[in-house]
């Protein structure tokens, strides 16, 4: 099974401020039943940003996956039991974890805020 991870850089200019999201490992091949961690780091001057994971499935449908901030995270109904996030505040990281991976998880995943 191939999980395609979207590679995105999002820049928001507010005067001289610049916010950025960086995803690494743009394409990953993952065996069904294993675990995958989709990496996302962000850079912002805001102390409690709203962070999101979205995905675009092979049929081009767009889906919300996960939301998080400094105190909580919440996933879409389909994420229950298999999807989670690792929000590491000190590293400004918001990684998506899928375990166990299923074929229906194949999609392009995007991290944003």
Swiss-Prot record:
GO biological process: adaptive immune response; immune response; innate immune response
Pfam families: V-set
Location in the cell: Cell membrane
Domain of life, per lineage: Eukaryota
Signal peptide residue numbers: 1-18
Domain Ig-like: start-end pairs: 19-113
Entry GO CC: immunoglobulin complex; T cell receptor complex
Disulfide-bonded cysteines: 40-111
Keywords per UniProt: Adaptive immunity, Cell membrane, Disulfide bond, Immunity, Immunoglobulin domain, Innate immunity, Membrane, Receptor, Signal, T cell receptor
Chief place of localization: membrane
Record SUPFAM superfamilies: Immunoglobulin
Self-association state and partner proteins as the record states: Gamma-delta TR is a heterodimer composed of a gamma and delta chain; disulfide-linked. The gamma-delta TR is associated with the transmembrane signaling CD3 coreceptor proteins following the stoichiometry: a single gamma-delta TR heterodimer associates with one CD3D-CD3E heterodimer, one CD3G-CD3E heterodimer and one CD247 homodimer forming a stable octameric structure. Upon activation, gamma-delta TR complex associates with FCER1G to initiate intracellular signaling.
Role noted for this protein: V region of the variable domain of T cell receptor (TR) delta chain that participates in the antigen recognition. Gamma-delta TRs recognize a variety of self and foreign non-peptide antigens frequently expressed at the epithelial boundaries between the host and external environment, including endogenous lipids presented by MH-like protein CD1D and phosphoantigens presented by butyrophilin-like molecule BTN3A1. Upon antigen recognition induces rapid, innate-like immune responses involved in pathogen clearance and tissue repair.
PANTHER family to which the protein is assigned, alphabetical: IG-LIKE DOMAIN-CONTAINING PROTEIN (PTHR19367:SF39), T-CELL RECEPTOR ALPHA CHAIN V REGION (PTHR19367)
Protein name (database record): T cell receptor delta variable 3
Species name: Homo sapiens (Human)
Gene expressing this chain: TRDV3
